[in-house]
Every structure is written in C-alpha cells, then in structure tokens.
Amino acid sequence: MPQETEQFCRDVNRMSAYLALDDFGGSGPGPEVLSGLDVIALLGNQVIATLKAACELMRRSLGATLVLSGGAGHSTPLLYDNLRLSSYGGLVRQGLVRETMAEAEMYTAVAQAAFHIPAGSILIESRSRNSAENARFSLQILKDANRRQRTILVLQDPTMQRRSMITWAREAEIAGSDARVLSHAVFVPAVEPGLDGMPRFPAGQVQGTWTMERFLALILGEVRRLRDDENGYGPRGRSFLPHVEIPEPVIESYKRVLASRLNAVAVR
C-alpha cells in the first residue's frame, strides 16, 4: 500500500478524532446519565446515525424533551437523499418525509413514525441555518415551552461536533443558561487505504453518511474555522468563536492533507 495513502489516512483520522468530541469515551451515555437528562438536542445534519441515536436515546431516557433543530441549508438535500436510501425510505415513499421539508421536520417524521416518540415530547426548531442559530433558537424554544433544561445532551454530525459545542457554550452564556451540556459524537469517522491506493470509508460508514468529497471538505473546513487566524472563526478572524487551542499534531495533519495530491484527486 502506498506510504502516501497511509499517511493521508492517518492525518485525516487524527483530524476526525479531534473534531468528534465525545464526553463518553465512545461508549455512549449510560443509564445513570440518561436518567438525569432533561433535553436531547439533535442539530441538523445529513448523517442518519445521529438521528437514529438521538431517537434511541430518547426512548431510553426518563421524560426528556427531544429538540430537533434544523432549517433549510447545504445539508438539507443530502439528508433527504440519505433518508430516501436508508431503512426509513418507506417514509419518503409514503410522503411523510418530503424534499421541501426543513431538516427538523424530516427528523420529526422519522422520530414519530419509526420510533413512536410522542409529539408532546418533541420541540421542533425549523428556522436555524447554522450552528449558532441551532443553539440560540433551541435554547429559546426550550425557554418558551418552559421545559426543564438542567442537563442537555447535544448530537451533531461528528465532523461538526466540537465546533457545535463551542458555539453552544457561547450562545448559552449570552442567553444566561447555566445548564450542564454534554457532547455525544455517535461515532468517529475514519478512512482507510483502498486497493486502488485511494482513501475509502470502512464498510460500516458508507451508507447514510457522506461522499468522500463532502467528508474531506467538512473536516478541512472545520479545522480551518477553529484555527484562530485571519481565515478562522476566532478573535483574530471573524470572531464567531473564542480562541481555540488546537493540538499541534492536528494542525500538522491539516496542512499535510490540504497540500496532498490525494485530497485533490479524492474531491474530483
């Protein structure tokens, strides 16, 4: 296997592991955590595993509120296509999930029809277009509905999990929320060398996720946003985020992947 591909995959996986922030060491929330959850918040994304996990955790919780957040954006048609090709595709054929829906509305259709989660346990936030609005509008609808929110579990596309948590913390501070907020990355995305010398997803990460082009664009875009320089979202850039101290090995991996011919070939 070409050494270049092996190095490329190691670098991609290092960035991915950093971005997929998880407070549970990969094992997921246990019964003790679930029994104390007030809110499970799923932020709009295209990865079907995040929707499935949020609904399954909701069913195991004791009276939590499920917040489904997501308007219409870049991920919306990708979410629809992934749902259409998934085990929930029957809901598309029945017209319960439609291409014109906001992400939160698609989520709601699946949560109710496939997981039998009562409508009264769900709050739908269908206006947000970015991670800041996901957090801001979710906190607002919880307040408007007078729902208890002492402990909140947040799920997002694993590539966006770290930035979403940083953004949520900032929006919570602005809103005066002192809730305990937990992060759950449903899985850590990975790539491996293929027989053709190109990076590929392991078999279990092919369906309901991303194209390789989309995945590489996401992780490179996330690290770029987190970097506190003129191109990032930190104080030295667009000031959307506080300063983030990214580990140097992650920065080095980012630079190598950005410069690699494999990145250019993979996204063609």
Positions of predicted regions on the chain:
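Generic secondary-structure transition motif, activating predominantly at the C-termini of alpha-helices
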Residues: 13-19, 23, 220-231, 258, ...
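A structural signal for short, hydrophobic/glycine-enriched beta-strand patches
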Residues: 1-208, 264-268
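A conserved mid-domain beta-alpha-beta active-site/ligand-binding segment of alpha/beta enzyme cores
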Residues: 190-256
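C-terminal accessory domains and tails appended to enzymatic cores
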Residues: 253-268
